[in-house]
Amino acid sequence: MKFKDYFKKNLIYILSFPLIVIAVYLPIVFNKSYCADLEYVQGAKGAIYNWNELGRYTLILLKKISFTPYNWILEGILFIIVSYLTLNALAYFMHLANSRLDTRLIFILSGIALIFPTFCEQYYFKFQAAEVLFGIFLLCLSGIFLIRTINDGEKLPFVISVVLTTLSFGIYQSMPNILLVMYIGLFLILCCTAKEKRILKNAFITVVIQFVLSFMANYLISHFLCKQGSYFSDKIMWNKLGASTCISYIKHYFKVVLLADSPMYSFAFIVALLIAYIALFVFFSKDILRVILTVLSIFGLIIAPFGIAIISGFEPDTRTQLALPFSIAFLLFFALSVLGRKTYKEEDADEGEKKDSKLIYFGIIFLALVLALNLIPSLRLVYTRYKIIQSDREHIQKIAGDLKEYNCLADSEDALDVIIIGTLPFYGDSVCVKSYLGTKEYILFSAFELDAHTPPTYFFSTNRILSAMETEGYYFKKPKVSNNMEDANNKAKDMPKYPENGYIKQYKHYVLVNL
C-alpha cells in the first residue's frame, strides 16, 4: 500500500493515537517547574551544558536552530508536534514490515513502544524531552528508508537512512540501543512473513552495513567535532569492580526489569516474553534455517535492551532504558504476525478474512491490556510529579516570601549568600509512587532533596533549591564557594526548623535557612 493510500485509510488513527502519548507526558514537559540541571542548561553558552563532551552534536544543533537552550513553552509545543511525527512514523515502519497486519493493532503496538515508565524519567529532563523523542523519530524514519532498500535495492534511501541514524545517535546515547532492537524486531517479523530467502539475506546484510556505517560516522563526528570527556569511560565498571561483581549487578538488573521490582518497570515485558514463547511453538516452517533465525532474533530482543548494562557492568540510569518498550512491542508484533499467518488461508481468502476479523478483535483487546500495563505506572509517576511540583511551589512561595525580609536579594550590591540546611522530602498521598531505599530516579525527588548529601553537605542542594526558586520568579544570591557550609551546619543545630518561627537567621557572611 502506497503512503498516500495508507494515509487516507488510517487518517483517524493517525490523528488520534498520538494524543495518548501527548496526554501521558505533557504534564511533565509542558510546565515551568524546576528540574535537575535546568539552571546549567539555561546558563550555558557555546557548547550548551556538557552535551559537547557527551557527543550530543545533533542535540546542540537543534538547540542552536531554536535560538535558545530552553524555553518551556517552545519545548512543550515541539513535544506535541514530535509526538505526532514519532508515533506515526513508527506505525508506518511496522506496517511496512508486515502490511497484512491490521493497522489498528500496529497503532496500539506503537503506543506500547512509546509509553513506558522509563520515558517519564527521561522526560523529567524536559529541556531535552522533545529532542530525545525527535531522535526516536529519526530512527523510525531511517527504518522506513531502509525497508525500501531491502525491498527494492535502491541506494539513495540507504544513504538517507545512514544520515538520519547518525543524526539520531548525536542526540542521546540510548539511540543505538533502540535502533538495535528495532532492526532485530524487523528481522524477526521478516522471518515470519517473508516468502523468499532473498529478502532475509538482503535484510541482514543491509541492516548490518547500515548500523556499522552509522556507528562509525557517529564516532568520527564525535571524535573530531566534540570535546573528549571521561563521562562514558567512567561508567564502565568491569575493570573497577571485577567481573563477578559486575555480573551480579547485571543479573540483579535483569531480575528487577523482568519482575517489575521497581516503579519504573511494568509486567508488560514478561507478558510479551510468554506470548512470544507460545507463538514460537505455534510458528512452523519446514525451513530449519528460518526457524533458527527466528529463535536467535527473539533471543536478541530479550538481550538487546540490556546492552547498556552489559557494556557498563552496572545497573544503568533508568532514563537510559528506552529500548525495553520497543522490545516488548516487537515481541508482541511477532506473536500477532504468527497468529495472522496461521489463520489466513491463501486458497480461501473469504474464510481467512473471517478468521482474521475475529483475531483482530482479540488482538485489540489483548494489546489494550498490555498498553494498560505500561500506562498505569506511567500515569502514577506523572501524577506523583505533579504533586511534587505543587508541594515544591508552596514551599518556595513561603520561604521566598520570608527571605525577602533579609539582605539576600540577588540584585542587591551587598547581598549575603543564602545557605539552606536540611531537606523537605515529599511523601504524597496513597496514589503517589513512594521513593524507596536507593532511589535514583529524579522524577521522585523534590527540589528540596536533590544533592543534599553530596559533599560538601547541603552546598549543592542549596544551589538547587535557589535555582528552583528562580523558576518561580524569586532571585536570591547563591553561594559560589562552600567556605561557610561547616559553620552554617553547626549553627543550624540550635535553630528552629521550617516552618516554625525563627527558621531563618542572618549572620555576618550569610543568611541561614534551616529546613
For each predicted feature, which ranges?
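Transmembrane catalytic cores of multi-pass membrane glycosyltransferases
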Residues: 22-79, 83, 87-89, 110, ...
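Intrinsically disordered, polar/acidic, low-complexity terminal segments
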Residues: 2-53, 57-58, 63-87, 92-107, ...
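Membrane-interface junctions at the ends of membrane-embedded or membrane-associated helices
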Residues: 1-5, 97, 146-159, 188-202, ...
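Transmembrane-helix signature of polytopic, membrane-embedded enzymes
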Residues: 94-118, 137, 155-156
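Hydrophobic membrane-insertion alpha-helices, especially the h-region
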Residues: 364-375
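Specific aromatic-rich, kink-prone transmembrane helix
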Residues: 133-151, 160-165, 182-192, 327
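Alpha-helical transmembrane segments of multi-pass integral membrane proteins
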Residues: 135, 315-343
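Well-ordered mid-protein domain cores that form the structural environment of catalytic cofactors
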Residues: 109-124, 129-147
